C-alpha cells in the first residue's frame, strides 16, 4: 500500500513540476511557447487521471489558440477535453471553460455558428446547478444569437439569465441581464418593452445595489441605453439631461482614485461580470456624444469628439486589439463622414469612407463588413449625390435598401432616393417611393428626425409642382417637429426652402423672415449647402428691394461657397477613393493606388449654383 502511495505522490510531484515549468515558459519574456507545450505534452506520458488529462488538454488548446496559428491542433485538444470532462461530476470549471473556449474557436473557424450554438446549448443545459457558469454561458450564447440577428432567441436567453440571477439573490447580475435584454429589444424596436425594462432596472440600481462602484458602472450602462433610446427616436432635446448625467458618470469612473475593475468585481464570483471595461465605456460615451452632436447639428463638436475618441481607440488597440474597438471605429467614421459632407468637405468624406472600408476588411470572415455593408453603400450614395453622380447614388441607395433589415436606415436611404428622383424629374418613381414610405411608416413609431425629413421631402416635392400652399403645410409640420427637439439642420433646411416658397409667391418680407434665421443656423452648424442656397435667395431679395450693397455682399458669399464646393469637387474626382462610387456588390475595391482622373465629369459652376429646381442638398 505504501509503495502505491509513494508512486502516486511521485506522479503528483511530476505533474506539479511539469505544470510549473510549463507556466514558467508561458510567462517568460518573450513566451517560450514551444517548451511550454512540450512540458504539457509530457504529462500525458504518465497516463494521468481523467481530470488531470482533461485539464491539460484544455490548457494545450488555450495556449495553441492564444500563441499559435495551429487552430486544428487546438480544436483536437479542446474536443478531447470536452469528451473527457462532459460526464464527470464536480468538475464544472474545466467542463464549462472548455465548452466556452471551444464555442469561441468554432465561431472563428466555421462558416456558420451552428456548432458553437449547439455546444453552448448543451453546456447551458448541464450547468443549471452552477449559477456562475449557467449565467456566463447564457450570456455567451445570447451574444451569438444577437450577432446572427436572432434577437427573439437572444432575448429569451437573457430573460432566463435574469431569473437565474434573481433566484440566486445576485442583484447586480440580474440588472446586467435586464439591461442586456433592453439593448436587444431596442434593436427590435420594441419601444414599450424597452421602457418597462429600463424603468425596472433603474429602480433596482437606485435602491438595491449597495456597492457604490458597481452602482456607478450599472448607471453608465443604463444611461448609455437611455441615451441611445432617445437618439433612436430623434429626441435630441429630450436626451440632454441623460447625456449630461452619462458624461458626469464616466468622468467619475475614469478618475485616478477610482478602483480597478478587478478590485470592484473580483470579490464575489456572481459579480465577476462586466458589460464593458471602463476604457471601452469611455470611448462609447464619446461615440454617443458624437451621435448627439451630429443629430443636433453641431458639426464642429462632432468632429472634435470623434478625433478624441479615435485617439483613445488607437491607444487601446496598442495595448490589446479587441474586436469591439473596430466596431467603435467604423461607427465613428460613419458619423464623421456625414458631418464632413454637410460642411462641404466631400474629399475628406470619401477618404474616411475608405478608412471605414479598411477597418471592415481587416476583420476576419468579413463579419464587420457584413454588418456595415449597407451603411457603407448609403454613405457612398450620399457622397455620389453630393458630387452630382446621380446614377451611382441611386444604385448605392438601392443596394442599401435591399441589404439592410434596419427600418430607419431603409427610410433614410429611401428619402435620399426621393430627392434624386426629384432632381432628375422622375415623377413616377418619386410617387412610388413616397407612397411606399408613407405606407411603411404610418403604423410604426419612427425617429422624429426621419419623419421630419419625410415631411421636408414632401414639401420639396410640392414646391417643385408649384403647389406652394401644400409645400408650406408640409414644411410647417417639419419645423414643428424640428423645433420641438432642436434638430438644427432640419430647421435650417426647412427655413431656407420655406423662404424660397415665399420668394416664389412674391412675399419678400416672409421670405426674408425665413432666410435670415436659416443662414444664422447654417453658419453655426456649419452647413455649406444651406449657405449656398440661402445666399442665392438673399441676393434676389436684396435686388428686389434695390439694396445694391447687400445684394453685392450676398453675391460675393454665394460665389465663395460655390467656389469652395467646386474646388472640393475637383479634389474628389481626382481621388483614388472616388472609384468606390462603382462598388455595388461583393467586397469593396481597395483604392490606395494612383488617383483616377475623371476631370471630364466635373460639373460646371452652374450645376452647383442653386437656380430654381436644383437647390435641394442631401437629406442627411
Swiss-Prot record:
The keyword Cell membrane appears for this protein: no
Entry keyword Cell cycle: yes
The entry's keywords: Cell cycle, Cell division, Chromosome partition, Mitosis, Nucleus, Repeat, TPR repeat
UniProt-listed Gene3D superfamilies: Tetratricopeptide repeat domain
TM region positions: none
Primary location recorded for the protein, binned into one broad class: nucleus
Cellular component, GO, one term: chromatin
GO biological processes: cell division; chromosome segregation; maintenance of mitotic sister chromatid cohesion
Disulfide pattern: none
TPR repeats (start-end): 452-485, 492-525
InterPro entries documented for this protein: MAU2, TPR-like_helical_dom_sf
Subcellular location: Nucleus, Nucleoplasm
One matching Pfam family: Cohesin_load
Record function comment: Required for association of the cohesin complex with chromatin during interphase. Plays a role in sister chromatid cohesion and normal progression through prometaphase.
Record note on quaternary structure: Interacts with Nipped-B to form the cohesin loading complex.
Family: Belongs to the SCC4/mau-2 family.
Protein known as: MAU2 chromatid cohesion factor homolog
Organism expressing this protein natively: Drosophila persimilis (Fruit fly)
Amino acid at each position: 500500500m505504501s509503495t502505491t502511495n509513494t508512486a502516486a505522490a511521485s506522479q503528483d510531484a511530476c505533474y506539479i513540476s511539469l505544470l510549473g515549468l510549463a507556466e514558467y515558459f508561458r510567462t517568460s519574456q518573450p513566451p517560450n511557447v514551444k517548451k511550454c507545450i512540450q512540458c504539457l505534452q509530457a504529462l500525458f506520458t504518465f497516463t494521468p487521471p481523467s481530470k488531470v488529462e482533461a485539464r491539460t488538454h484544455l490548457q494545450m488548446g488555450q495556449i495553441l489558440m492564444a500563441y499559435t496559428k495551429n487552430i486544428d491542433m487546438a480544436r483536437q485538444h479542446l474536443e478531447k477535453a470536452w469528451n473527457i470532462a462532459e460526464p464527470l461530476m464536480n468538475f464544472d470549471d474545466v467542463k464549462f471553460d472548455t465548452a466556452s473556449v471551444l464555442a469561441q474557436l468554432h465561431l472563428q473557424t466555421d462558416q456558420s455558428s451552428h456548432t458553437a450554438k449547439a455546444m453552448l446549448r448543451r453546456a447551458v443545459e448541464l450547468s443549471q446547478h452552477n449559477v456562475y457558469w449557467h449565467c456566463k454561458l447564457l450570456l455567451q450564447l445570447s451574444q451569438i444569437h444577437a450577432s446572427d440577428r436572432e434577437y427573439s432567441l437572444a432575448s429569451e436567453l437573457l430573460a432566463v439569465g435574469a431569473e437565474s440571477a434573481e433566484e440566486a439573490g445576485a442583484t447586480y447580475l440580474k440588472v446586467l441581464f435586464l439591461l442586456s435584454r433592453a439593448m436587444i429589444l431596442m434593436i427590435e424596436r420594441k419601444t414599450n418593452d424597452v421602457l418597462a425594462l429600463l424603468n425596472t432596472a433603474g429602480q433596482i440600481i437606485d435602491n438595491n445595489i449597495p456597492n457604490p462602484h458597481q452602482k456607478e458602472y450599472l448607471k453608465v450602462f443604463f444611461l448609455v441605453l437611455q441615451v441611445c433610446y432617445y437618439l433612436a427616436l430623434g429626441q435630441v432635446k429630450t436626451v440632454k439631461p441623460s447625456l449630461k448625467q452619462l458624461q458626469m458618470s464616466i468622468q467619475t469612473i475614469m478618475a485616478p482614485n477610482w478602483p480597478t475593475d478587478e478590485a470592484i468585481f473580483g470579490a464575489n464570483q456572481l459579480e465577476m461580470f462586466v458589460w464593458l471595461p471602463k476604457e471601452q465605456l469611455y470611448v462609447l460615451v464619446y461615440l454617443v456624444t458624437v451621435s448627439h452632436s451630429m443629430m443636433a447639428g453641431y458639426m464642429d463638436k462632432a468632429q472634435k469628439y470623434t478625433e478624441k475618441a479615435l485617439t483613445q481607440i488607437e491607444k487601446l488597440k496598442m495595448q490589446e486589439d479587441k474586436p469591439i474597438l473596430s466596431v467603435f471605429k467604423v461607427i465613428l467614421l460613419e458619423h464623421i463622414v456625414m458631418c464632413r459632407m454637410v460642411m462641404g468637405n466631400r474629399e475628406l468624406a470619401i477618404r474616411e469612407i475608405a478608412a471605414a472600408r479598411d477597418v471592415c476588411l481587416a476583420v476576419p470572415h468579413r463579419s464587420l463588413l457584413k454588418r456595415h455593408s449597407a451603411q457603407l453603400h448609403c454613405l457612398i450614395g450620399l457622397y455620389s449625390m453630393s458630387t452630382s453622380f446621380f446614377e451611382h447614388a441611386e444604385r448605392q441607395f438601392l443596394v442599401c435598401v435591399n441589404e439592410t433589415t434596419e427600418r430607419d436606415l431603409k427610410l433614410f436611404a429611401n428619402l435620399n432616393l426621393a430627392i434624386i428622383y426629384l432632381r432628375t424629374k422622375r415623377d413616377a418613381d418619386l410617387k412610388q417611393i413616397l407612397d411606399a414610405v408613407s405606407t411603411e411608416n404610418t403604423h410604426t413609431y419612427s425617429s422624429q428626425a426621419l419623419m421630419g425629413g419625410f415631411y421636408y421631402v414632401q414639401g420639396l416635392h410640392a414646391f417643385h409642382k408649384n403647389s406652394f400652399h401644400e409645400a408650406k403645410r408640409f414644411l410647417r409640420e417639419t419645423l414643428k417637429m424640428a423645433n420641438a427637439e432642436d434638430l438644427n439642420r432640419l430647421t435650417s433646411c426647412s427655413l431656407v426652402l420655406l423662404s424660397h416658397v415665399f420668394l416664389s409667391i412674391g412675399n419678400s418680407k416672409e421670405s426674408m423672415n425665413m432666410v435670415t434665421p436659416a443662414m444664422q443656423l447654417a453658419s453655426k452648424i456649419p452647413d455649406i449647402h444651406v449657405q449656398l442656397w440661402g445666399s442665392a435667395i438673399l441676393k434676389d431679395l436684396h435686388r428686389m428691394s434695390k439694396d445694391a450693397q447687400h445684394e453685392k455682399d450676398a453675391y460675393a458669399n454665394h460665389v465663395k461657397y460655390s467656389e469652395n464646393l467646386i474646388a472640393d469637387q475637383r479634389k474628389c474626382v481626382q481621388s483614388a477613393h472616388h472609384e468606390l462610387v462603382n462598388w455595388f456588390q461583393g467586397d469593396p475595391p481597395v483604392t490606395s493606388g494612383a488617383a483616377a482622373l475623371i476631370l471630364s465629369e466635373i460639373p460646371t459652376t452652374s450645376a452647383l449654383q442653386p437656380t430654381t429646381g436644383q437647390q435641394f442638398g442631401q437629406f442627411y
